[in-house]
Amino acid sequence: MAVKGVDISGPIAPCTAADLKAAGVEFVICKTGFGSDYPGQQDSGFAANVKLLEAAGIPWGAYHFSYATTRNGGISEAKHMLRLLNGRKPLYGVWFDMEANSTLGGDLPGAAEGFCETMEAAGLYVGVYASTSWWQNYLTSPIFDKYDKWVDRKSTRLNSSHQR
């Protein structure tokens, strides 16, 4: 069974929940922020987007854009995301977004494991997001087999067949 969803970052206004539903969107994955737990590294639209989705009864999940290159960096980013989630447990889980070229050469398996273990300890469903090329070229450690994968395959055609 296919379920139609979108991922968003920044404020989605003037888009409304009715617009999303009219487009057939059944769930949304919202960006919480990026990097470690420092002021200003939260997504500018996260809180408002979640409020809009919850009011409309649209289930959501969340992703965090990573710059972590170590296990401790992944843990720090998880703590940042947990603070931004503020106790919420999104139905569509939380996702560790690994696609920053600046992280290449770092301990990517350790960063992912630190993030994912921290989120699981908080009672959240967690997975790892990356593009097809990242999965094929950089995220090849068996550590990644412990977590669900969200594989981004971009398309320029609306309604094209792709997975997320």
Task: Tell me the role of every PLM-derived stretch.
Residues 1-33:
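Boundary/entry segment of secreted carbohydrate-active catalytic domains
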Residues 2-4, 59, 125-126:
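Short beta-strand/loop segments at the ligand-binding rim of alpha/beta enzyme cores
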Residues 8-11, 33-35, 65-69, 99-101, ...:
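Active-site beta-loop-alpha junctions enriched in small/polar residues
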Residues 15-24, 43-58, 81-90, 144:
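Acidic (Asp/Glu)-rich catalytic clusters
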Residues 22-26, 79-95, 99-157:
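Surface-exposed substrate-engagement region within the catalytic domains
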Residues 25-38, 50-69, 93-94:
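Short, well-structured secondary-structure segments
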Residues 42-45, 68-82:
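Glycine-rich anion/phosphate-binding loops
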Residues 158-164:
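Single conserved hydrophobic/aromatic residue that forms the stacking wall/gate
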